[in-house]
A protein has these predicted regions:
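Hydrophobic residues within well-ordered alpha-helices
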Residues: 6, 48, 108-109
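Active-site neighborhoods of divalent-metal-dependent phosphate/nucleic-acid chemistry enzymes
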Residues: 74-115
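Short, well-structured N-terminal submotif of metal-dependent ribonuclease cores
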Residues: 1-39, 53-63, 135-140
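A generic structural signal for short hydrophobic patches within well-formed alpha-helices
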Residues: 10, 45, 82, 123-124
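Acidic, PIN/NYN-like endoribonuclease modules and their adjacent C-terminal/linker elements
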Residues: 105, 110-140
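Short active-site oxyanion
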Residues: 34-38, 71-73, 112-114
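Helix-adjacent hinge/juxtasegments
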Residues: 50-52, 59-76
């Protein structure tokens, strides 16, 4: 199975104090043990590294870079994808929706992915099957 991984999931896996950590860890282990192909975007990587650096520190950034990043298939965002996502952001006109989210949705469409490991309700709004499934109604 091919699965998109969002910043919200990466952060929940990396930070034991995060409210979603208990739900994230078993999903992460299952994904790794199941030999699933894990996808993300270059924008999610930038967002994740910045978040880890500011909230946890550089040791966490190094750990993520050494142990998690090599496991990922990275969708490198080109100008066309950026423009499409930027347009989608402007059309949506919502303060709670980010450019990184819109880039992720565009990447999901281009990669024909239907499942995402995340704690972001915007993915479910896009018709994406999210993991952990039981959190569909209760994520931020």
């Amino acid at each position: 199975m091919n699965v998109f991984v969002d910043t919200s999931a990466f952060y929940a896996v990396m930070d034991a104090d995060d409210e979603h950590h208990p739900a994230a860890l078993p999903v992460w282990v299952d994904l790794l043990e199941g030999a699933h192909r894990l996808y993300t975007t270059s924008y999610v990587l930038v967002e994740t590294l910045a978040l880890l650096q500011s909230r946890i520190g550089m040791d966490c950034v190094r750990l993520f870079s050494a142990d998690i990043q090599p496991l990922l298939q990275v969708f490198w965002v080109d100008e066309g994808t950026h423009r499409s996502a930027h347009h989608a952001l402007l059309v949506a006109g919502r303060r709670d929706l980010s450019l990184v989210d819109c880039v992720s949705f565009e990447a999901l469409r281009q990669l024909r992915l239907t499942e995402a490991f995340c704690f972001d309700a915007h993915f479910a709004e896009q018709g994406v099957q999210i993991m952990p499934e039981h959190l569909k109604g209760g994520i931020a």
